[in-house]
Amino acid sequence: MIKKTQGTEIRALARHIGMSAQKARRVIDQIRGCSYEQTLMILELMPYRACYPIFKLVYSAAANASHNRGLKEADLFISKAEVNEGVIVKRLKPQARGRSYPIKRPTCHITIVLSERPNFTLKNI
């Protein structure tokens, strides 16, 4: 299902990322509401494995905004960021004496929405 966003919202979606949604949410909660440049700095300095796919997704969304809509990257901020659980990939690990144990690899879907920060000018009354 394709959702159309109104105004100057740019939406980027990464699906089937190989990590649990809980670990990705730990990083997403830190960048929600931040500006584009501040988000990139935060993601480069955080020591979590979830930072790299989120960094790529934010960078891709900003590139789409500048190429498709002609927006400046300096005016963008993260207006919405969410992580949803994906499918669980199931594998079997062989054990001794012909037995096997299941391995469950969780995946997640990450959605980033960038918006243009409104420019307010104060008028002297």
Curated annotation (Swiss-Prot):
Gene Ontology biological process: translation
GO CC term (a single one): chloroplast
Primary localization class, coarse: plastid
Stored InterPro entries: Ribosomal_uL22 (IPR001063), Ribosomal_uL22_bac/chlpt-type (IPR005727), Ribosomal_uL22_bac/org-type (IPR047867), Ribosomal_uL22_sf (IPR036394)
Keyword Nucleus part of the UniProt annotation: no
Organism domain of life: Eukaryota
Keywords: Chloroplast, Plastid, Ribonucleoprotein, Ribosomal protein, RNA-binding, rRNA-binding
GO molecular function, one term: structural constituent of ribosome
Subcellular location field: Plastid, Chloroplast
Function: This protein binds specifically to 23S rRNA.
Subunit structure comment from the entry: Part of the 50S ribosomal subunit.
Family per similarity comment: Belongs to the universal ribosomal protein uL22 family.
Name used for this protein in its record: Large ribosomal subunit protein uL22c
Organism: Nuphar advena (Common spatterdock)
Name of the encoding gene: rpl22
